Curated annotation (Swiss-Prot):
Compartments it resides in: Cytoplasm
Record lineage: Bacteria, Bacillati, Actinomycetota, Actinomycetes, Pseudonocardiales
Entry keywords, A to Z: Cytoplasm, Endonuclease, Hydrolase, Magnesium, Metal-binding, Nuclease
Record: residues binding Mg(2+) 2: D16, D142
Enzyme class, broadest EC rank: hydrolase
Gene that produces this protein: rnhA
Listed GO MF terms: magnesium ion binding; nucleic acid binding; RNA-DNA hybrid ribonuclease activity
PROSITE patterns: RNASE_H_1
Family assignment from sequence similarity: Belongs to the RNase H family.
Cofactor annotation comment: Binds 1 Mg(2+) ion per subunit. May bind a second metal ion at a regulatory site, or after substrate binding.
Subunit composition and interactions: Monomer.
GO cellular component, one term: cytoplasm
Protein's name in the database: Ribonuclease H
Length: 155
């Protein structure tokens, strides 16, 4: 497969989470891009944390892909998500979902779901994006996450 054709089969997910208070009402947002097609998604919960919403954004973005994709590029401003998936998860799985300090992994249910969603696709790349720094898609994902949070506050 050529580099050009693999790029055409790639999906970009721009994700963000937002929370008022920690814990408190929170929301997640995703901008999904496949070629020239875009989709925006968001949701929220009445009592959650910022880390749960950051994880949920990635999970929901991947879950929205109804077929396996050869290349998914995930753009997140969450170092928690980025380090969790690229540095910590292998050890957590090896240790039965315990940290190196033998404590249960926080948000293990979401990490397991993320691991499962990642397994449905080919290559997944992770890119950290500085939050609130004018990155257009990250700003859109942030607005969606805030919308989800605001709607959760009202319910």
């Amino acid at each position: 497969m050529t580099q050009h054709s693999s790029a055409q089969n790639a999906v970009d997910l721009y994700t963000d989470g937002a929370c008022s208070g920690n814990p408190g009402p929170g929301g997640w947002g995703v901008v999904l891009r496949y070629g020239h097609h875009e989709r925006e998604m968001y949701g929220g919960e009445t009592a959650t944390t910022n880390n749960k919403m950051e994880l949920t954004a990635v999970i929901e973005g991947l879950a929205a892909l109804t077929r396996p994709v050869p290349l998914v590029r995930i753009h997140t401003d969450s170092t928690y998500v980025l380090k969790g998936i690229t540095e910590w998860m292998r050890g957590w799985k090896r240790n039965g979902w315990l940290t190196s300090a033998k404590q249960p992994v926080k948000n293990a249910d979401l990490w397991r779901r993320l691991d499962q969603e990642c397994g449905r696709h080919g290559e997944i790349t992770w890119e950290w994006v500085k939050g609130h720094a004018g990155h257009p898609e990250n700003e859109r994902a942030d607005k969606l996450a805030c919308k989800g949070r605001d709607e959760a506050k009202k319910s």
